[in-house]
């Protein structure tokens, strides 16, 4: 779960069209959110308030071994009008989870229409007690596509009582670059991320639409980082690849990543898929080419819908569903798109009707499998030599695929979830992490446990156990 200050920072990025997913450090953010999520330790309560549209404050009190806390302030040069308190904020915005990577053409259009982000800035500071530890952060937008990020920590337990990290970031639709300097060991780093291909360059005019693969909105990103510590003369190097796509038949996204560190010989691959609107599955495999050590990690998250009044939640009982449930719901809200859907439906062969299965508690679960089509979905009736017919059908298929993709994404964004259950395990480390996060009255609650197996007695041990309450106006 994000802290309130982290949430405000993300709201600033959204309002100024700064794409966090285009930064190299976030290339594996989806798998980290499902496998490496933090577990609260002890008892913690966080009370925050946005006094104006430009400023906010937060007070944190925790009890782990001893009573400690912190006091934080934040100031933004532009009004943060797109923020909400813990009572009204959606869990999708308050909790780290699956990230839907948008194609570069969509990012370009958003950045092009940006007006307010040229000179925006954010100031943040936090003081910890007991003790004299301080931390601060400055975000200054230099141009539409570049910004300066400075992070500082002052702690008497650190060398020279603190450290400072400076990021000079350039973020465009096609690529992103970061120049980093840290006072800790005089560390200098360079990060680059490049998005391969361009959605506008895909030209299917001369290809029959019946044999176009049923996947669209794919993004391939490749990046690398190079580090050099001048004080210890130690180098660092890593590279990563990310492939993200969405099925045009169901609209469900998936993301695959591959990360390599050639110096230590570490290779890591992840596969994450959003199996339904309310569930996500992730797997990760680590391997070391020098020691031949390997590890398999598995994790998932499952959202629960908020309790609704009778007949307020859409029920598909006693109805036949020929398309995906997400597509049907989206078309009901947008009747103007129904014509494209009906025309596409008549051109293709009839799909097998799928009955819904109703659970207790007025919850309806739709079978995610529509039919047993081939991946390329070849229909002999569409193999026409007429060029005009082929072009018309191509436009209809494109409109329908975009409708299904947008339907699933809008259904995820508009769903009212009350809680999320996360689970992850590692076979080699023999660690199990369980986390529950949800809304309780006007509070956001996070509670979980981390279990490990004692290597000597082979008995489970509690490594972490705690609960956290967050409240924000």
From Swiss-Prot:
List the keywords (alphabetical). Answer: Membrane, Mitochondrion, Mitochondrion outer membrane, Transmembrane, Transmembrane beta strand
Top-level taxonomic group: Eukaryota
User: What's any one GO cellular component for it?
Assistant: ERMES complex
Topology in the lipid bilayer is annotated as: Multi-pass membrane protein
Task: List localization entries.
Answer: Mitochondrion outer membrane
This chain's function reads: Component of the ERMES/MDM complex, which serves as a molecular tether to connect the endoplasmic reticulum and mitochondria. Components of this complex are involved in the control of mitochondrial shape and protein biogenesis and may function in phospholipid exchange. MDM10 is involved in the late assembly steps of the general translocase of the mitochondrial outer membrane (TOM complex). Functions in the TOM40-specific route of the assembly of outer membrane beta-barrel proteins, including the association of TOM40 with the receptor TOM22 and small TOM proteins.
Family, similarity comment: Belongs to the MDM10 family.
The Swiss-Prot or TrEMBL note on domains reads: Lacks alpha-helical transmembrane segments, suggesting that it resides in the membrane via beta-sheet conformations similar to those predicted for other outer membrane proteins and porin.
This protein is called: Mitochondrial distribution and morphology protein 10
What is the source species?
Candida albicans (strain WO-1)
Encoding gene, per UniProt annotation: MDM10
């Amino acid at each position: 779960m994000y802290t309130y200050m982290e949430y405000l920072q993300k709201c600033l990025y959204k309002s100024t069209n700064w794409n966090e997913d285009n930064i190299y450090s976030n290339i594996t953010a989806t798998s980290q959110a499902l496998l490496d999520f933090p577990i609260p330790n002890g008892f913690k309560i966080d009370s925050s308030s946005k006094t104006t549209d430009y400023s906010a404050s937060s007070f944190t009190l925790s009890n782990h071994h001893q009573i400690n806390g912190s006091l934080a302030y934040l100031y933004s040069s532009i009004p943060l009008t797109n923020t909400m308190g813990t009572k009204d904020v959606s869990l999708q915005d308050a909790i780290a989870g699956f990230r839907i990577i948008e194609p570069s053409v969509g990012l370009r259009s958003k950045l092009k229409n940006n007006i307010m982000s040229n000179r925006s800035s954010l100031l943040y500071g936090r003081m910890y007690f007991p003790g004299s530890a301080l931390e601060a952060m400055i975000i200054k937008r230099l141009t539409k596509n570049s910004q300066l990020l400075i992070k500082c920590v002052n702690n008497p337990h650190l060398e020279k009582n603190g450290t400072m990290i400076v990021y000079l970031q350039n973020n465009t639709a096609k690529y992103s670059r970061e120049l980093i300097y840290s006072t800790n060991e005089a560390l200098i780093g360079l990060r680059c991320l490049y998005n391969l291909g361009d959605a506008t360059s895909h030209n299917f005019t001369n290809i029959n639409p019946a044999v176009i693969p049923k996947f669209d909105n794919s993004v391939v990103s490749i990046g690398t980082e190079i580090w050099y510590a001048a004080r210890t003369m130690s180098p660092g190097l890593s590279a990563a690849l990310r492939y993200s796509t969405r099925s045009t038949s169901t609209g469900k996204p998936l993301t695959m990543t591959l990360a390599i560190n050639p110096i230590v010989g570490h290779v890591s691959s992840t596969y994450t898929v959003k199996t339904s609107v309310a569930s996500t599955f992730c797997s990760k495999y680590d391997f070391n080419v020098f020691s031949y050590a390997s590890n398999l990690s598995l994790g998932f998250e499952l959202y629960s819908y908020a309790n609704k009044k009778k007949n307020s939640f859409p029920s598909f009982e006693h109805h036949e569903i020929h398309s995906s449930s997400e597509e049907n719901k989206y078309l009901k809200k947008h009747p103007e798109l129904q014509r494209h859907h009906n025309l596409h439906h008549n051109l293709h062969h009839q799909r097998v009707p799928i009955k819904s299965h109703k659970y207790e508690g007025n919850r309806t679960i739709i079978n995610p499998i529509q039919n047993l089509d081939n991946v390329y979905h070849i229909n002999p009736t569409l193999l026409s030599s007429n060029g005009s017919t082929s072009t018309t059908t191509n436009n209809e298929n494109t409109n329908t695929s975009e409708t299904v993709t947008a339907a699933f994404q809008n259904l995820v964004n508009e769903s009212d979830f009350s809680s999320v259950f996360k689970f992850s395990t590692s076979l080699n480390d023999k660690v199990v992490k369980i986390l529950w996060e949800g809304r309780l009255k006007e509070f956001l609650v996070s509670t979980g446990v981390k279990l490990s197996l004692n290597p000597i007695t082979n008995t489970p041990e509690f490594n972490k156990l705690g609960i956290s309450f967050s409240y924000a106006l």
